[in-house]
Structure formats: C-alpha cells, structure tokens
Regions:
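Intrinsic disorder at enzyme termini
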Residues: 1-8
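A structural signal for short hydrophobic/aromatic patches embedded in well-ordered alpha helices
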Residues: 12-13, 74
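Glycine-rich flavin
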Residues: 21-112
Length: 112
C-alpha cells in the first residue's frame, strides 16, 4: 500500500507553491484585506487559469475531477502563503453539488 503523494499530486503541490511564491505578496494580501476589489478579481482570474476553481468539479462538468486530498494540498499551500481566495468555500460547494447534476458546477469551475 502506497501512502505517499502521487507524482501528479507532487506536481500540483509544486505548481501551487510556485504560484503563491511568485504571485501572492504580503502587499497583495494587504490590498485585498483593505477592500481592493480589482486586486482580488485579478488573483481570482489567475487561480481560475490554473484550474483551481474546478479542482473538485467532475471533468464532465468542466472541472479537473480531482479529489479531496488534492484540494487539501492546495489549501495547505494557500495557508502557508496567506492567500486571500475563496478556494475552500468554492471547493466545498462543488464537492457537495457534484452528484446533484446541478448546472452550477460549470460556473464554479470557470469562476462565473
């Protein structure tokens, strides 16, 4: 039985860590905390481009179709970098809705 991360999970973790290091400065966190909506929207667009909004959304609904462990790895990286994003709430909503046949899953996956 294998208890380590898969190669894909390690790659996901490294990608998110690199993104956080390069894109999420303390100044950016402060700007968003102070209500800079455009800064928050730009960050959200970048996270969508990485495919993180649809991490737990099934592929048939426009997402990545990954699992809860993958989402936990992303959240861990976000926590380390104090990333002010709605990743966790969107992920929980997507996970709850994934078997419902809801058309909103595609909207979650595409940050709509």
């Amino acid at each position: 039985m294998e208890f380590g991360l898969s190669e894909d999970q390690v790659m996901l973790q490294e990608t998110v860590r690199r993104f956080v290091a390069e894109e999420v400065s303390l100044d950016l966190v402060r700007q968003i905390a102070e209500g800079e909506i455009q800064v928050a929207e730009t960050l959200a667009e970048k996270l969508t481009a990485l495919g993180l909004d649809g991490l737990l959304v099934p592929e048939k609904d426009g997402g990545s179709g990954l699992g809860v462990l993958d989402a936990a790895l992303v959240q861990e990286c976000f926590g380390y970098g104090i990333v002010p994003a709605r990743f966790l709430s969107n992920s929980v909503a997507a996970y709850a809705l994934r078997d419902s046949g809801s058309s909103i899953l595609n909207d979650i996956a595409n940050n709509d």
